[in-house]
Amino acid sequence: MLGDGKEGTSTIPGFNQIQFEGFYRFIDQGLIEELSKFPKIEDIDHEIEFQLFMETYQLVEPLIKERDAVYESLTYSSELYVSAGLIWKTSRNMQEQRIFIGNIPLMNSLGTSIVNGIYRIVINQILQSPGIYYQSELDHNGISVYTGTIISDWGGRLELEIDKKARIWARVSRKQKISILVLSSAMGSNLREILENVCYPEIFLSFLTDKEKKKIGSKENAILEFYQQFSCVGGDPIFSESLCKELQKKFFHQRCELGRIGRRNINWRLNLNIPQNNIFLLPRDILAAADHLIGMKFGMGTLDDMNHLKNKRIRSVADLLQDQLGLALARLENVVKGTISGAIRHKLIPTPQNLVTSTPLTTTYESFFGLHPLSQVLDRTNPLTQIVHGRKLSYLGPGGLTGRTANFRIRDIHPSHYGRICPIDTSEGINVGLIGSLSIHARIGDWGSLESPFYELFEKSKKARIRMLFLSPSQDEYYMIAAGNSLALNRGIQEEQAVPARYRQEFLTIAWEEVHLRSIFPFQYFSIGASLIPFIEHNDANRALMSSNMQRQAVPLSRSEKCIVGTGLERQVALDSGVPAIAEHEGKILYTDTEKIVFSGNGDTLSIPLIMYERSNKNTCMHQKPQVRRGKCIKKGQILADGAATVGGELALGKNILVAYMPWEGYNFEDAVLISECLVYGDIYTSFHIRKYEIQTHVTTQGPERITKEIPHLEGRLLRNLDKNGIVMLGSWVETGDILVGKLTPQVAKESSYAPEDRLLRAILGIQVSTSKETCLKLPIGGRGRVIDVRWVQKKGGSSYNPEIIRVYISQKREIKVGDKVAGRHGNKGIISKILPRQDMPYLQDGRPVDMVFNPLGVPSRMNVGQIFECSLGLAGSLLDRHYRIAPFDERYEQEASRKLVFSELYEASKQTANPWVFEPEYPGKSRIFDGRTGDPFEQPVIIGKPYILKLIHQVDDKIHGRSSGHYALVTQQPLRGRSKQGGQRVGEMEVWALEGFGVAHILQEMLTYKSDHIRARQEVLGTTIIGGTIPKPEDAPESFRLLVRELRSLALELNHFLVSEKNFQINRKEV
């Protein structure tokens, strides 16, 4: 990205670069670092020594391809081999062997790993950087209390605080604190050394009492005092080696290991020059920190902003994988120790290969990718989603924050985020501000800091030489950084005027001559999602946030279409997502079909397999369509085949459709959307979805389960699609309830159900007669479609732990329907409320009916005016057959630049098409349109245009659900919750109030008793419904009331209830 040859030029970096660089750093540095830490292992008698020679490690190329790993549910990994030596000290003999340590999952070209056939991605985490931080808080008297917090590499904290008598304490736990002199003495310093190494010895001497002198008289006394306070132990503990080890393990290892980043930060903050390889906290650090704290008390020095990015570090893929390798090697060390002692005990001669097993490394990485919170299943809804997922930054995870504990200041946008973390793109809900997204040009530096690029402007001539710099958050505070207008092309005017700039987290207006650096790109401070929104500068940030989230939920359509109005980043996103097939070198196409493209180049013939109807983990359809013809010559980097949601190598998530902003009979009230039937019959918003259904065969105690077509007691109609093996045939159309895989599970029948001849066989020959239970895979509700693939995965060693898995893939074609969610790129979302015949839709002056009607009231209050600009410019583009790519913040060139562009294009479209209604000067951008039902014009002119509208993955087919009867919760006896459990609809507190307000007593009673948790009453309802007659009233209490009584009894409170007769007011007491 840094172009040194051509000064002042830069290109957009690869969007997966962060992941690739992290993995490369792990393979190149992290692997060797961890292997070099592996200790020499000796037996108890010190006769045998085992060691690894990490200089000769080797990673072997995987035997399987990525696609096969996904198909067979395997891990795409590389085998790690290291040379190991076993030395017999008595004879000085050494046996050296190349040993297999385990498998390390590899990263593929998408920046993801394939583990057990599933694409997984590791998220970057933001943590508080290890080092020291000074802060002040007000106590209950309103006096400032200064504290210095030392944060270790593991996240452990040691707090130094100064009281009003200028005494310095180290807080070792929430309740206990000890004098700084005791801590320094316990760490190995005597009083003379302490006083020689501090700037204010008189302050240290001032709180040195006789009692304190006794505590620090010797190192042993100091350690005992420290141990007593730290462990809250009463009495007089005795100094011993085990006591020192316990302190070392519980305190010094957790709270005093700084790591290389922590050592660098402390050296910089306290002005020390301790060597970088000293990664533990030293007495000198403690004393320098105390000096600095005293200076703070007297008004010298500055406090630290904990939320500034210079005080944060990024824990990347490299760090996480390296930590796991260290963990695996520690487990391997224990295994080797155990094996050596076992071999000596049994008088066996060990070899390096016998001592080492590959299980610790392989299982550690499998559990890391499967269970670690920062390892997530790659979201593959569309190409944008795949790329954005790998660029997330999370404050959550081990050592980080939680959604419940994080305060508002941490979630808020900080000035240091500028050009590093996107101020717009974050999740909604409890994790808002805790999960961010990397800005386009940001990169992770060597010390775990986020760096952003700037152009350096030289003093003498602001034009002649321009150089590009990458600055960390701690460096860019010292520069005047121009923003906004400084990017204008008209440099002549610019030099005469003042420009907005950023300096030390403040925004100033300064003369152009004073500028040191300037931004390199209009998109520099945004993430990819936000950079795809045209006219984003005219939108409220909340709506831009929703839009960048909703673009990730867009479903790839069966016929994709490029946006007329875009930002120019669409091509880069599509290329980096790996969805289109791209030529790796030039050549000539020899053959092409839907399955593969064959071309010759460099004297070789290459065959590129295409993805055909592959399921993503969000059930969307991934498919590649060839874009080249036979005999055509191609160049390196040319698009060979388009993928899902790409057209000509550009991202294409939605459709440009004709939209009017107007109310229509209340059908678009409150974000509802009215659409034309053309969108359904023209397959404009039709998408394909592939669902996976699987079943496993186990070996039970009664014998193995069988896959068969011969299923007793089932109608032949349900088995019509099965082949002779009992598995559904490819290409068959299946409906709800059909059998996909026939399976019988052996089951021993009860004694009473045996036939007499079975009993005779059992008595004479001892043969156990088994009957089979039908456990077939049936198609659930809403699953109807076409079977497009069947996979029978048989894992090696087909034991009961490795069952055979049969997977059936069914494709569904879904047109747009009432209840589906659609959205624009400006946070304007809505649910389809009605599908109108095309003749009833409002139509334009040239007779074209509108495709979609939005509510105009959704624009002013939400302040997302960008959609109006996009809408009008899209209309002009469709009439002129042009596509526009507009960078954000075009107002830096001139005022009202967006509006001028839109109106000039509309005027040109009006002239070229000879349609004066396209641009009418009285109400520019609006037009008179007609009611399709009556043919009369509407009273007011209406904004019409062609915005880019997406269909989202929230579809009514996945949400709609009904329940007549089903399962009940065991404790409350109320229906379960959720669609997956066939649950019921909750009637909550507010729903009860609504029914009470209408006075519908009987409906309310039904909902709270028969339909819910009154066990006897609901059984009676079933009987009376079948026989006919009136439903009897429930007489006793429902189960939830009985549950309340039981819970009160557990608190020793007895609650009795009575039934009062309506006729004679007789009180009838009943036991609950």
From Swiss-Prot:
In plastids the minimal PEP RNA polymerase catalytic core is composed of four subunits: alpha, beta, beta', and beta''. When a (nuclear-encoded) sigma factor is associated with the core the holoenzyme is formed, which can initiate transcription. The keyword Ligase does not apply. It holds the Pfam family RNA_pol_Rpb2_6. This is DNA-directed RNA polymerase subunit beta. DNA-dependent RNA polymerase catalyzes the transcription of DNA into RNA using the four ribonucleoside triphosphates as substrates. Belongs to the RNA polymerase beta chain family. It catalyses: RNA(n) + a ribonucleoside 5'-triphosphate = RNA(n+1) + diphosphate. It is found in: Plastid, Chloroplast. Keywords: Chloroplast, DNA-directed RNA polymerase, Nucleotidyltransferase, Plastid, Transcription, Transferase. The keyword Nucleotidyltransferase applies. Its EC number is 2.7.7.6. One of its GO terms (cellular component) is DNA-directed RNA polymerase complex. It comes from the Eukaryota. CDD domains: RNA_pol_B_RPB2 (cd00653). Gene3D superfamilies: 2.40.50.100, 2.40.50.150, 3.90.1100.10, DNA-directed RNA polymerase, beta subunit, external 1 domain, DNA-directed RNA polymerase, subunit 2, domain 6, RNA polymerase alpha subunit dimerisation domain, RNA polymerase Rpb2, domain 2. GO terms for molecular function: DNA binding; DNA-directed RNA polymerase activity; ribonucleoside binding. InterPro entries: DNA-dir_RNA_pol_bsu_ext_1_sf, DNA-dir_RNA_pol_su2, DNA-dir_RNAP_su2_dom, DNA-dir_RNAP_su2_hyb_sf, RNA_pol_bsu_bac, RNA_pol_bsu_CS, RNA_pol_Rpb2_2, RNA_pol_Rpb2_2_sf. Signal peptide: none annotated. GO terms for biological process: DNA-templated transcription.
